Amino acid sequence: MQYTIVILLLPLFTFLLLGLLNSKLKPMIAGTIGTVSLAIIATLSYICAFEYFTADRVNGVFETVIMKTEWLRFSDTLHIDLGLLLDPISVMMLVIITTVSLMVHIYSLSYMKGDGGFQRYFAFLSLFTFSMLGLVVATNIFQMYIFWELVGVSSYLLIGFYYTKPEAVAAAKKAFIVTRFADLFFLIGILVLSFYTQTFDFDILTSGDASVFANASGATFIDRKSTRLNSSH
């Protein structure tokens, strides 16, 4: 499980490497770098999953592993952390994402051969993989939102990969604009939830802690009473 940070950051490093060097690299070298990188993190994902599912359980339940550090603090109770969360679902998703991405990379080596944007394509694939991995191991809903947006950006770049073709550009713009509407309401929901619960963390929101939701209900009740009193005056 100590490999998780490598699993997450290696695709980002690959994206930066291929993006910065771009045409300085020969196409097949760029493709090989991207594919080998994915092969490494796919292998590490399988090792991570094996270690996680064979580890001792706590009261018969798989342990939730959380590694995080504080990033932004708004108050004593409300802050945003950056970190990694490992539970059965996220560990399995690491395996699924890296496996599918590796197969896409291998297939693309021959499918994209001779394309002028070969290096750029593999850079975008690495960014997409990084975004998906960050999405499934996020420790809080705001961090998940950041990676959700990165997934949208990656999709936009891949859909509009052939930017000289008007239809590709139009499809990319359409996908980007439509998803932004949904993302706006997603963000509003996050802000409303954090305002009433005073937390972004998944472990607190899903813990069943009655005090969190009691505070939210109490705040809603007070707001309603204040509104009624003000309107009566």
Predicted feature descriptions by range:
Residues 1-231:
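...captures the hydrophobic TM-helix bundle architecture rather than a specific catalytic motif
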